[in-house]
């Protein structure tokens, strides 16, 4: 493999959802956003709910977007592995389903705040963050 190319694999409990070469990746870890180049120093980090941006070597103008809902990223040599709770490529996101999830989360958050239930507030905020992330990533079509 070329020194300027790495392989990105995104794995979820449902299986492998992405397995391609890349020459640049951005991801949001629990410590902030990182840019990943081939042959970087080995790293393991937790991932936030956010989008992955993947620039592939076969088309410098195209970026693949993936909605990631938490997980772990491992960078080792020319292999980047992400094990995520769930993840979807932008082309696979059902926008109407994501919109419905957003509405449900907003309603749940409103009820939880009215009842002052902190656990329910936290769950609703995470659900809302996931839905908004999916909607954001789906807009990159």
Curated annotation (Swiss-Prot):
Q: Where in the cell is it found?
A: Cell membrane
CDD domains recorded: F1-ATPase_delta
* An annotated GO cellular component: proton-transporting ATP synthase complex
| Database matches in InterPro entries | ATP_synth_F1_dsu/esu (IPR001469), ATP_synth_F1_dsu/esu_N (IPR020546), ATP_synth_F1_esu_C (IPR020547), ATPsynth_dsu/esu_N (IPR036771)
Keywords in alphabetical order, please: ATP synthesis, Cell membrane, CF(1), Hydrogen ion transport, Ion transport, Membrane, Transport
The record's principal subcellular location, in a coarse class, is membrane
Top-level taxon in the UniProt lineage: Bacteria
Q: Which GO terms describe its molecular function?
A: ATP binding; proton-transporting ATP synthase activity, rotational mechanism
- UniProt topology in membrane: Peripheral membrane protein
Provide the function of this protein: Produces ATP from ADP in the presence of a proton gradient across the membrane.
Question: What HAMAP family is this protein classified in?
Answer: ATP_synth_epsil_bac
How does this protein assemble? F-type ATPases have 2 components, CF(1) - the catalytic core - and CF(0) - the membrane proton channel. CF(1) has five subunits: alpha(3), beta(3), gamma(1), delta(1), epsilon(1). CF(0) has three main subunits: a, b and c.
- Family affiliation: Belongs to the ATPase epsilon chain family.
Protein's recorded name:
ATP synthase epsilon chain
Taxonomic classification, please? Bacteria, Bacillati, Bacillota, Bacilli, Lactobacillales
Gene that this sequence comes from: atpC
